[in-house]
Amino acid sequence: LLPLIGTPKTYVEPFAGSCATALNVDAKRYVMNDINADLINLYKYLINPNDDSFIQHCGDFFRPENNDKEEYISLRKYFNDSTDTLERSRLFVYLNRHCFNGLTRYNSGGGFNVPFGKMKNPMLPSTAMMDFRMYFLMRKHIFANVHFDDGRLYAGLGSGDVVYLDPPYVPASDTANFASYAKQGFSYDEQV
């Protein structure tokens, strides 16, 4: 895949997710987007050049007493009730590492609803977070939280630019149907 992408002037990823592909692309400019506001807010706080303490504060939730089903449910409720994007971003890291299989799923009311994961010793991914931070701090970037068909994501693109589309996947069966990456979900019609 990377040889096909090459070294674009601008690299646009409308379904950024973990940014795994972008972290392996050498572009001059990155436009990263995801419909999940919690994810994009996390990235914005993580790469804020004026705040070196974000990762450390995320670690405040990674205490042995918080690796417990009741504490998890309590912190998940706190996350769902909070409107403070900074606090939600810190808790989002905790939820991702303590929930079942690291899933991100929301109910129709917009509440994060993944159950407790029973991990033995979930760790703060501080090295990966620092690597992500340094990668994007050293490059021109935009992180957006808009619908994938929003024209602003693609404004000014031309020769030498790449748009990488890796949308959520069509379920293999009715029981595998999962498209609740954000409150509004992602329908089959949007995928095709």
Cite the ranges covered by each PLM segment.
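Short glycine-enriched, charge-decorated loop/helix-capping segments at active-site entrances
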Residues: F178-G185
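Short, glycine/acidic-rich beta->alpha junctions
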Residues: P14, D189-E190
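Conserved S-adenosyl-L-methionine
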Residues: L4-R63
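SAM-dependent nucleic-acid methyltransferase catalytic core
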Residues: L4-T7, N48-Y164, P168-F178, E190
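Helix-loop module immediately N-terminal to the HCX5R catalytic loop
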Residues: L1
